[in-house]
UniProtKB/Swiss-Prot annotation:
It comes from Homo sapiens (Human). Pathway: Protein modification; protein ubiquitination. GO terms for cellular component: anaphase-promoting complex; cytosol; nucleoplasm. It comes from the Eukaryota. The mammalian APC/C is composed at least of 14 distinct subunits ANAPC1, ANAPC2, CDC27/APC3, ANAPC4, ANAPC5, CDC16/APC6, ANAPC7, CDC23/APC8, ANAPC10, ANAPC11, CDC26/APC12, ANAPC13, ANAPC15 and ANAPC16 that assemble into a complex of at least 19 chains with a combined molecular mass of around 1.2 MDa; APC/C interacts with FZR1 and FBXO5. The C-terminus of APC10 binds to CDC27/APC3. Interacts with PIWIL1; interaction only takes place when PIWIL1 binds piRNA. Interacts with FBXO43; the interaction is direct. Gene3D superfamilies: Galactose-binding domain-like (2.60.120.260). Residues 2-185 form the DOC domain. This is Anaphase-promoting complex subunit 10. The gene is ANAPC10. SUPFAM superfamilies: Galactose-binding domain-like. Component of the anaphase promoting complex/cyclosome (APC/C), a cell cycle-regulated E3 ubiquitin ligase that controls progression through mitosis and the G1 phase of the cell cycle. The APC/C complex acts by mediating ubiquitination and subsequent degradation of target proteins: it mainly mediates the formation of 'Lys-11'-linked polyubiquitin chains and, to a lower extent, the formation of 'Lys-48'- and 'Lys-63'-linked polyubiquitin chains. The APC/C complex catalyzes assembly of branched 'Lys-11'-/'Lys-48'-linked branched ubiquitin chains on target proteins. GO terms for biological process: anaphase-promoting complex-dependent catabolic process; cell division; protein branched polyubiquitination; protein K11-linked ubiquitination; protein K48-linked ubiquitination; regulation of meiotic cell cycle; regulation of mitotic cell cycle. Belongs to the APC10 family. The modification N-acetylthreonine is found at residue 2. The modification N6-acetyllysine is found at residue 169.
Amino acid sequence: MTTPNKTPPGADPKQLERTGTVREIGSQAVWSLSSCKPGFGVDQLRDDNLETYWQSDGSQPHLVNIQFRRKTTVKTLCIYADYKSDESYTPSKISVRVGNNFHNLQEIRQLELVEPSGWIHVPLTDNHKKPTRTFMIQIAVLANHQNGRDTHMRQIKIYTPVEESSIGKFPRCTTIDFMMYRSIR
């Protein structure tokens, strides 16, 4: 059992993007849900609006499946939950699994959440802080607060590390001979 990274209350994952070290890749994936109430599905989970949410409609575990077309490097998963708004619909126990497909998923994190309010940052790295490479991520809601049946998740974001480019890493021309040939006429 692990606890999610401690971040300042309500820390916006877009701050991660602004650092230039990660980018959001959720739009590159195919999303599916184990169940949802009409009008409370994937579109609401991905619309960048903290007032909308996915609401499950069935028995637990409630699943969010995120499938990539090719093996993808993932570093951080961010989930927005709000106990004050959702009460018994708020997840209290979440399992994060990765794999090539539904048949070989392995749990890499299990989280215990106590009345969460804001963004929950879940590192998808190994013991050496190396990001995970996977075709699929599954988020399973195993339990809710107050033994609630259905769940609400307001937003989910997935981040990959930004790879450094070799452009601009060449040494500068410093001698007169090199400077003569540094531009093309």
